[in-house]
Amino acid sequence: FKELIDLANKHPRVNILQPGTGVGGHCIAVDPWFIVSEFEKETIIIRNAREINNYKTDWVIEKIKSTALQFELDNNRKPIIALLGLAFKPDIDDLRESPALQVAETLLAENKYDLLLVEPNLEQSDKYDLSDYEKLNGDADIVAYLVAHKEFKAFETETIELDFCGVKS
């Protein structure tokens, strides 16, 4: 999919953005629903777009779960999964309506996975036990990039990497 975006972006008037874990934040993820609620028939495309964007988060969750299952089958143990990035967009500390946070909360709620949550733009969290990405040092068996924070571009690991935000491209 990335190759198609790169090819299309060679055209001078095209700028397709890198898809991420989903659409988040306190505006874009929420405001369209106000319009849809008032003009239901006229806003079918807006409703469909939001539903598709919301589905992307579910797809990411399933991809992480299937990778974890394959790791477990191959190694006879559960993997440690590092989820890198919890904010709703790169290089901020705002978790409001964050699809990356939804991924983390869904996996935490299932209580089946050993998770390391990493958000370099937050020093601490009252709700989450955050790990320092610089100290992962091979602790994780699977690294899932959920948000393209600048810190993650140079992060190197020998483990399985799932890049959902284009930080490694």
Predicted regions and their residues:
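Structural/interface elements that position substrates and couple domains in central-metabolism enzymes
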Residues: 1-169
